[in-house]
Swiss-Prot record:
Catalytic activity: UDP-4-amino-4-deoxy-beta-L-arabinose + 2-oxoglutarate = UDP-beta-L-threo-pentopyranos-4-ulose + L-glutamate
Source organism (scientific name): Escherichia fergusonii (strain ATCC 35469 / DSM 13698 / CCUG 18766 / IAM 14443 / JCM 21226 / LMG 7866 / NBRC 102419 / NCTC 12128 / CDC 0568-73)
Protein name: UDP-4-amino-4-deoxy-L-arabinose--oxoglutarate aminotransferase
Keywords assigned: Aminotransferase, Antibiotic resistance, Lipid A biosynthesis, Lipid biosynthesis, Lipid metabolism, Lipopolysaccharide biosynthesis, Pyridoxal phosphate, Transferase
Gene from which the chain derives: arnB
Modified residues (N6-(pyridoxal phosphate)lysine): 182
Upper lineage: Bacteria, Pseudomonadati, Pseudomonadota, Gammaproteobacteria, Enterobacterales
Swiss-Prot/TrEMBL cofactor(s): pyridoxal 5'-phosphate
EC number: 2.6.1.87
Domain of life, source organism: Bacteria
Length: 379
């Protein structure tokens, strides 16, 4: 269908092509100066002391958990309303993911829910800044400090998200994603920010074979030939081709997110006259990056269920997404946690639908979605 409106499309242009061309012509296409520039730019954005670029947010989560020495016998608290990679990384390290419920209307963990899940085995909390809105990090950090456990902010949705005047992640350790549908993208990539010098050093070692230097050394303009393996590590470094694209996108972040905000506002105004329920906005001061615009499709209220709506929109040439099916309902986790019940998560998991939202959308594109929702409501 030539006029199909996808759920998401990356906003790429001449600047990204020029950035890639520059790297290709430089003769250094793997981890190099563009990685350093990207890390420095993120430090400027978030205010953290350290930034470590990696091949994906999942890779960043893996080595952050490893650096915190999380393993067998440990518990990590995470919402089930998240992408399964977080649960997978916890499980692969031999630790136990403690999946908790979320607020029914923001789909984020609350301090009360998190504190109730803490046990003597708890080593970390992973709150998710969901859909571009910030979790209540001050309250969560207060709980973590009281119990002596780590906080790892899942900021995959949150480049450009601010909480009480600070960019998310500014207070501690956070992981960002540059996946193809994210607010800034380089197809695949991620980045960890932190103020912990020891953690940053371990992440740089773990992301590149356990070597004592990064893939690209600032002083030697290349890999130090005397580099030694300090610990077994991984191949999680980001190429400069990807880093150059991400850096170019980061320079355009304000305008990219402003366009997302405009489309989201158009949706919000339209939903006043429709039965579909958007997510509630957090009560605390914040700037939303509008990674996703999610509606809840309750059949009793809307006259149509979520799956039928998504299929009907597809037939009208409109793509949608599902973020996310609750992790504890996936086969592996269902088998390992058969008695787990998370009512708010489950209610939303059966009803959430992500509408098209990306910077290159026009107002007419958004109006097309709104018109289709009007046509389908009550069917």
């Amino acid at each position: 269908m030539s006029n199909f409106l996808p759920f998401s499309r990356p906003a790429m242009g001449a600047e990204e092509l020029a950035a890639v061309k520059e790297v290709l012509e430089s003769g250094w296409i793997t981890t190099g100066p563009k990685n350093l520039a990207l890390e420095d730019a993120f430090i400027q954005l978030t205010g953290n002391q350290y930034a470590i670029a990696v091949s994906s947010a999942t890779a960043g989560m893996h080595i952050t958990l490893m650096a915190l020495e999380i393993g067998p016998g440990d518990e990590v608290i995470t919402p089930s309303m998240t992408w399964v990679s977080t649960l997978n990384m916890i499980s692969l390290l031999g630790a136990t993911p403690v999946m908790v419920d979320v607020d029914r209307d923001t789909l984020m963990v609350t301090p009360e829910i998190v504190e109730a899940a803490i046990t003597p085995r708890t080593k970390a909390i992973i709150p998710v800044h969901y859909a571009g809105a910030p979790a209540d990090t001050n309250a969560l950090y207060a709980i973590a400090e009281r119990h002596g456990i780590a906080v790892i902010e899942d900021a995959a949705h949150a480049v450009g998200t601010y909480y009480k005047g600070q960019h998310v992640g500014a207070r501690g350790t956070a992981i960002f994603s540059f996946h193809a549908i994210k607010n800034i993208t380089c197809a695949e990539g991620g980045l960890v920010v932190t103020d912990d010098e020891s953690l940053a050093r371990q992440l740089r070692t773990l992301k590149f074979h356990g070597l004592g230097v990064d893939a690209y050394d600032r002083q030697t303009w290349g890999r130090a030939p005397q580099a030694e393996v300090l610990t077994p590590g991984y191949k999680y470094n980001l190429t400069d081709i990807n880093a150059a694209i991400a850096l170019t996108q980061l320079h355009k972040l304000e305008q990219l997110n402003a366009r997302r905000h405009d489309i989201a506002t158009q949706y919000q105004h339209a939903l006043v006259n429709l039965p579909f329920q958007p997510l509630a906005l957090p009560a605390w001061p914040h700037i939303h990056s509008w990674h996703l615009f999610i509606i809840r499709v309750d059949e009793q209220r809307c006259g149509i269920n979520r799956d039928t709506l998504m299929e009907a929109l597809k037939e009208k040439g409109i793509g949608t997404g599902l973020h996310f099916r609750a992790a504890h309902t996936q086969k592996y986790y269902r088998q390992h946690f058969p008695d787990l019940s998370l009512p708010n998560t489950e209610w939303n998991s059966e009803r959430i639908c992500s509408l098209p939202l990306f910077p290159d959308m026009t107002n007419a594109d958004a109006e097309r979605v709104i018109t289709a929702l009007h046509q389908l409501a009550g069917q």
